[in-house]
Amino acid sequence: MDLNGKCVLLGVSGGIAAYKMANVASALRKLGADVEVIMTQNATQFITPLTFETLTGHKCMVDTFDRDFKFEVTHISLAKKADVILVAPATANVIAKMAHGIADDMLTTVVLAAKCPKLVAPAMNTGMLENPITQDNLATLERYGFTVIPSESGVLACKDVGSGRLPKEEVLIEHILHTIARPKDLAGVRIAVTAGPTQEALDPVRYLTNHSTGKMGYAVARAAAMRGAEVTLIHGPTALQPVRFTEDVPITTAQQMYEAVTSRFEDTDVLFMAAAVADYRPAAVANDKIKKKDGDMSIPLERTPDILGTIGPKKTHQFLCGFSMETRDLVENSSAKLAKKNLDMVVANNLKVAGAGFGVDTNVVTFITPDGTRELPLMSKADVADAILDEILKRRGL
C-alpha cells in the first residue's frame, strides 16, 4: 500500500515530541507521498526547519509573512494542495486555537482554510490532556469532523507516568493510510473475517492446533478496513499485531469461533472464513496433566461444529467466501467444498507451491466460483487480499 500521488501536510507544534515527526516525514516519502511541513514558531525550538526541508524537498513554512518563496497566497495554496493534514504533536495551545477558529499563525490559518480530512494527535503532560478544557476542545474538533488519534500512556518527558505520549510513528502513518490511501469502495459494507488457528485442549498443558499464523486473514481484514468496510476480525491465538480500525474478537477454540461467527452472521454482508479451524477436538479434557507411560496412548477425538456447513444453507443476502488449504487435487476438493457448503467463492491454497502456505508473506491462490476458476500468480498476501475484495465487489455489484 502506497501514497503515490498524495500530498500529506504535517503540522508540527511546539512539543518535545516534535523531533519524532522527522521519522514520520521520511517514512511517508518512502511510501511515495509528497510531504509538506508547517511548523509553529515554538516547534522550531525542538527541531529545525532545515531537517524537514532536507527530508521532504520542500521549504518548511513557519512565518505567515515569509517572503522567501515563489509568490502564492501560501495558506490557501497549501490548504488546497493537501489530501490530508496531520497535526502532530498537537499541543494544548494549538488544539484550543483550532477548536475556536483562531488563525494567528501559518499552521492554524491553513487548518482553518483546508477542506481535506484533518487528523490531530495530542501530545502533552497528563494533567494538561485530562483537563476538562482540553477534553472539551478535542470533543469540539471531533464535532467539526477532525479525527483525534488517542495519545498513548507511559513515562512522559516530565517524568510523570500517564497518558499524553505521542502515538508511535507507525500508528500515525496507519491513520494517514486509512484516510487517503485507498478509495472507500467498501463503505457501509459489514465484513466479518476469521483468521488464525484454534486450540483444542487435551489437558491443562497440551492442546491440538495447526500451523496457521493468521497472516492471510489479517491481510484481508486490513485491506477491507482501508477500503472503508465495517470489519470484525474473529481470530484465534496469533503473534500478529491487532488490525486497526476493526472490531477485534479473540477466541481460542473451534466452539468459540462457531459462536462468534453465528451470533454475528445475520448482521454480516460478507464473511471470509480464512481461519484454520480444528475439525476435531479431544472427546474429553483431562483435569490434570496426562503423565507419560510405557507404550502407546490413544486419544479419542470428536468432530467440532462445521461453521460453514451450518450457516451456508441459511444465508440470505450474505456473500460467503471460504478458504481451503490442500496438498493435492486443489481444484476438485475446493469445488466440492463450494457446492457442499453453499458458498459463493473459495480461495484455494496449494501448500506444496513455493511461496504459499503458512507463515510466509506471499501466497499463490486460485479463485473457485460457480463460474469457474482463476489462478493468481505469486504475490504478497496484502495484494492477494485486495484481489479477493476486487473479485467480491465485481460479483456483488457493489
Regions found by a protein language model. Name each.
Residues 1-119, 125-398:
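A cross-family phosphate/adenosyl-ligand binding-site feature
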